[in-house]
Curated annotation (Swiss-Prot):
Region spans: Disordered: 89-110
Name of this chain's protein: Transcription factor sphG
Compartment(s): Nucleus
GO cellular component: nucleus
Length: 735
């Protein structure tokens, strides 16, 4: 006969056993009961307590507590009334005739609403974390780190965690989330080589694509002024070239090539696995210019003096870091750009009218609006407060997008950013006071009205976009931004009884659906081309809501399918991104949840897993590498993820040289003998090779001239050598 356990010997309380959750086994009250305000009971028999009895006791206990609370509030109200009534009754001898008494405040029933009927809503809180090194970090509520920690907490409450396989996968997922949160630490760097001036041939080839596809989204320079800057660099001696101008030229090339890379990715995704190549000239070029951008970061102290070109260099570096490097570095670069812009009065651009040319004034105006919008994006993604208040920026009420060189979508985006700032100041800021239901409802209604007016003025029909497959990519972006702001508005007040605040999961699903549609849409004036930049600027609440719904068992099969499609899309656009970049971390977080979902499905299909191997063959194969101390993008000792052969060729160090490579034959079966013959082969290849519609004759000429440039800077290798010709020919074949 089994030994009967006494109350003191029984290891699980009745409440935790009834809820099927892990008990901390602390007596007289475990942690779960203490957190939920329940009376921790120990039956001593090891049996599951009766659910009806437990529910009855819970309801009676809550009723008793509510009755005590109402009584205490009523007594407090009476005491306060007596206090105010007593203070208003002043004896005649105590009154001062020179200053008549002001009417005493009278308390009405409206001053003390029933606390049971009127809930109080406070601002959402962030997360405070102390790591193993005792480093303290604070994350805002909308930051990716804070949302990842929320998902980590939710994993243990997800269904089927009592099963061994699912439990192991959940524990592994929590470790992976801890690793993701710890990524992106800035490490001080020592002296490094300054950035090198990129080849002028490539620069000239990229100016027109940038101002055609990317400038409307990030109006950092005017085309006229940038062309003048590039011409001045070409005519000046290497020792006299300005560092900020070099950084601007390098980043323009990088942004233009990055904007075209999603199209290259989609072309590769349409190819079979047998014919798909793992490398392309796009990515090899990007990694070379990205290395040059990292060198600019290492010399950031030379870019903080008050000059307009320094502001432009810092803003372009921020955009590059937003996509390729860590969130922390991106935020730091924008903060430096904002401080430098304020010091030269960029936001008071109207004050320069009459003193500067119209082109210079318009350039400052566009840069001011661009900074304001980027500041609001970082406010949500990094969880920090805005650095540029609307009071510091001059918004022209007569602004017409088609006039004065103003991009068409800039006005709508700036107005949307102003609404985002209002949402932050009224809901997320530190000074926000608690509000009741009516106050929360009234503010939300006012913001929704402003958002609708903003869409109407830009000609965007949200209902039509949601119900049909039509709509331009630019309208899709505005609709996604609209849904994102709506989610920021209602997400902190999920427990509000108004139906509007219960729509967060539906809004998040629609936002994810439109994002996937934008990804698959054809290029539309560059809107699809800058998809990576756009995705990195969105707060990740949409993904958080979808992941939470799936983990809690409320997600549908369509949600899981969209998540899988989202993972594939992120994998496509983050192949050459740093592990700590924003989009790459979105990809890794989505993979973690996908692993947990797959483990659940596998467990349900095979309740008795065999011991021959792991039950789930899909356990984050890309995240199973040994954990590191964090991504150190500024550490000179860290191995950078780029093709060293290309970096040694384009941005040649003094002691660098081309690595030996195998030869590649021409179309005739023989190696090209000279540079002229090789250049003609490049041009003919650009015209005949399939899928090379983006590499026109100008681009081919730029690549050919770059061979001559590399020959001049590479001192130890000839441009006619087989290694140089083979490298370029191989990359062209990989397009």
């Amino acid at each position: 006969m089994a030994k009967e356990l006494s109350r003191d010997e029984y290891t699980v309380c009745d409440q935790c056993r009834a809820r099927k959750i892990r008990c901390s086994r602390e007596k007289p009250s475990c942690r779960n009961c203490g957190r939920l305000g329940l009376q921790c009971e120990w039956s001593g028999q090891g049996k599951k307590c009766n659910q009806t009895t437990l529910l009855s006791h819970t309801i009676l206990g809550m009723g008793s507590r509510l009755e005590q609370l109402e009584t205490a509030l009523a007594d407090t109200q009476k005491s306060l009334k007596r206090l105010f009534d007593g203070s208003s009754t002043i004896s005649p001898s105590a009154r001062c005739p020179a200053s008549p008494a002001s009417p005493s405040p009278r308390l009405s029933d409206k001053r003390f609403p029933d606390s049971i009927q009127s809930a109080v809503f406070t601002r959402p809180l962030g997360r405070f974390l102390v790591d193993q090194d005792r480093d303290e970090r604070c994350f805002g509520p909308t930051s990716l780190e804070s949302l990842m920690l929320n998902i980590k907490d939710e994993l243990l409450q997800s269904p089927d965690t009592d099963r061994h396989t699912v439990k192991e996968c959940v524990l592994q997922a929590q470790r992976k989330i801890d690793h993701l949160v710890g990524q992106g630490e800035e490490i001080p760097i020592g002296g490094k080589a300054p950035p090198t001036m990129p080849p002028f041939a490539i620069l000239e080839a990229m100016i027109e694509p940038y101002f055609t596809t990317t400038h409307g989204h990030f109006p950092i320079w005017s085309k006229k002024r940038f062309t003048e800057m590039a011409t001045a660099l070409r005519q000046s001696a290497p020792s006299e070239r300005d560092l900020a101008s070099i950084v601007c030229c390098n980043n323009l090339i990088l942004m233009a090539m990055s904007a075209d890379s999603p199209g290259s990715h989609q072309r590769e995704s349409m190819m079979s696995k047998q014919t798909r190549k793992t490398s392309s000239i796009d990515f090899d070029l990007i990694t070379g210019f990205l290395t040059n951008a990292k060198r600019a970061v290492s010399n950031i102290d030379q870019l903080v003096s008050p000059h307009l070109v320094n502001v432009q260099a810092l803003v372009s570096l921020h955009i590059v870091a937003q996509v390729y490097l860590s969130i922390g570095l991106s935020e730091t670069l924008l903060a430096l750009a904002i401080r430098c812009a304020k010091s030269i009065g960029v936001h008071q651009w109207h004050a320069f009218q009459g003193r500067l040319s119209d082109d210079d004034v318009n350039e400052r105006q566009n840069l001011s609006y661009c900074l304001y919008m980027l500041d609001k994006a970082v406010c949500w993604t990094a969880g920090s407060s805005p650095s540029i208040p609307v009071s510091d920026v001059h918004f022209d009420p007569r602004l017409v997008p088609s006039e004065n060189g103003i991009p068409s979508s800039l006005v709508a985006k700036a107005e949307m950013a102003r609404i985002e700032e209002t949402v932050y100041l009224e809901i997320y800021a530190v000074h926000v006071q608690a509000r009741d239901e009516n106050q929360v409802r009234g503010f939300a209604a006012a913001i929704m009205s402003k958002l609708q007016v903003c869409l109407t003025e830009t000609g965007v029909d949200l209902d039509q976009i949601q119900t049909s497959l039509d709509g331009s990519a630019s309208n899709l972006q505005l609709a996604i931004r609209y849904l994102s702001v709506q989610l920021l508005l209602i997400w902190p007040h999920k427990h509000h009884p108004d139906p509007m605040f219960q729509q967060a999961p539906e809004v998040a699903r629609m936002c994810l659906k439109l994002l996937l549609r934008l990804w698959h849409s054809p290029p539309d004036q560059g809107s699809q081309a800058v998809f990576s930049f756009f995705l990195a600027s969105l707060p990740s609440l949409y993904l958080y809501e979808v992941l939470i719904s799936i983990l809690c068992g409320r997600g549908t099969n369509r949600d899981i399918d969209m998540l899988q499609e989202f993972v594939e899309m992120l994998q496509t656009i983050t192949d050459c991104r740093a592990e700590a970049s924003y989009n790459r971390r979105l990809y890794q977080l989505s993979l973690i949840v996908t692993d947990v979902v797959k483990a659940r499905r596998t467990q349900h299909k095979r309740p008795k897993p065999t011991s021959e191997g792991p039950t789930d063959p899909y356990l984050m194969s890309e995240l199973l590498s040994p954990a590191t101390t964090g991504y150190s993008y500024m550490n000179s000792e860290v191995q950078e993820t780029y093709d060293s052969r290309f970096d040694g060729g384009v941005f040649q160090d003094p002691d660098g040289s081309f690595a030996p490579m195998s030869s590649i034959t021409s179309t005739s079966g023989e190696l090209a003998r000279g540079s002229d013959e090789f250049l003609s082969q490049l041009r003919s290849y650009g015209k005949s090779a399939p899928g090379n519609e983006h590499f026109d004759s100008l681009a081919m000429e730029a690549l050919g001239e770059s061979v001559l440039f590399w020959k001049g800077v590479n001192q130890g290798a000839s441009a006619d050598s087989p290694s140089v010709r083979c490298d370029l020919g191989e990359r062209l074949n990989y397009i």
